[in-house]
């Protein structure tokens, strides 16, 4: 199984804390290289529309070249690892747990270009990333019965999410939730089950209206919506062709403290609707009209020139976590 996601980002960051004395002879393990990489990773996490926050794993290459006037161009090749924090989770990425290899880890390779003005500290950032999970063969080689990643749109995954959400809504008098995004699904063994992770939001519907495919529910007004991230296991066979009805399940939902104006508050309207699965697997994601305000709709280069990313002394840097 192969998953591919291309994340194309263009934006602007003002007020950098980096020194105006930009070194041009950086090696991948230098402190300054880590600062540049952190800037790129922070930007990715602030503008990523789906799934999980990313953490720096390896600085593969860094090249700093003079540009026009006071501008300096910093070219980076980065390897990132998926964390267990959803993009809506306000937890700083430094405190997020890296998804372990036995839980079918996912890596992301990114090319980043940062245009830095040494006088004003203004930055323009361009990032392009491809996300790929560990291969099923590698997962099973290291752990024969570890859960295997499924597509978020897999029927068993979607059915499991709907089943758990309906059970929750039945128990919450006066509160109805809908799915914002199905972020992850896995097939588990001994006992056989489906493990799912998904984000939900409270909506202004009655329970009856929520079950009506012709009725469109909307999140509560700003400041009133409750957003939660759920992890659940539904115990059922992969061979089962019917939707779950009376299966045993375990679930845990945590309310996320997403403030109005938070970098990802746009996700509420971006995702709301039935069967909202993440497009991050087997798909390409690019900026369109619905992207956050920080994006600009104009032609941008899609590749970072190889002449700026040729291997340099001291690169690649050390592996901070593990290599897939």
Swiss-Prot record:
CDD domains, per database record: CY
PROSITE patterns found in the cross-reference section: CYSTATIN_FETUIN_A, FETUIN_1, FETUIN_2
Keyword Oxidoreductase among UniProt keywords: no
Domain Cystatin fetuin-A-type, first and last residues per copy: 22-130, 141-254
Cleavage (site feature) positions: 140-141
Signal peptide extent: 1-19
Subunit and partners: Homodimer.
Family in the record: Belongs to the fetuin family.
Identification of the protein by name: Antihemorrhagic factor cMSF
């Amino acid at each position: 199984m192969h998953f591919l996601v291309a994340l194309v980002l263009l934006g602007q960051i003002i007020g950098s804390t980096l020194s105006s004395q930009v070194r041009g002879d950086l090696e991948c393990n230098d402190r300054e290289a880590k600062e540049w990489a952190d800037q790129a990773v922070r930007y990715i996490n602030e503008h990523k529309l789906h799934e999980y926050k990313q953490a720096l794993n390896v600085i593969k290459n860094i090249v700093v070249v003079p540009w026009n006037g006071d501008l300096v161009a910093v070219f980076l090749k980065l390897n990132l690892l998926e964390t267990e924090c959803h993009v809506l989770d306000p937890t700083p990425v430094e405190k997020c747990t890296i998804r372990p290899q036995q839980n079918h880890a996912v890596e992301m390779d990114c090319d980043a270009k940062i245009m830095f003005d040494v006088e004003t500290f203004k930055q323009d950032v361009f990032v392009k990333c491809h996300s790929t999970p560990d291969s099923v063969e590698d997962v099973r080689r290291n752990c024969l019965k570890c859960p295997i990643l499924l597509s978020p749109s897999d029927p068993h995954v979607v059915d499991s999410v709907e089943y758990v959400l309906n059970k929750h809504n039945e128990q919450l008098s006066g509160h109805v939730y809908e799915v914002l995004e199905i972020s992850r699904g896995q097939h588990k063994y001994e006992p056989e089950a489906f493990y799912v992770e998904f984000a939900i939001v409270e909506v202004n519907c009655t329970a009856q209206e929520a079950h009506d495919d012709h009725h469109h529910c909307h999140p509560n007004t700003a400041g009133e919506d409750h957003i939660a991230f759920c992890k659940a296991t539904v115990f059922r066979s992969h061979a089962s062709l019917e939707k779950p009805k009376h299966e045993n399940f375990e679930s845990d939902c945590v309310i996320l403290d997403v403030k109005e104006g938070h970098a990802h508050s746009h996700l509420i309207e971006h995702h709301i609707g039935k069967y909202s699965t993440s497009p991050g697997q087997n798909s390409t994601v690019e900026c369109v009209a619905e992207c956050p305000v920080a994006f600009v709709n104009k032609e941008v280069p899609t590749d970072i020139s190889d002449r700026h990313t040729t291997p340099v002394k001291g690169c690649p840097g050390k592996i901070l976590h593990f290599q897939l």
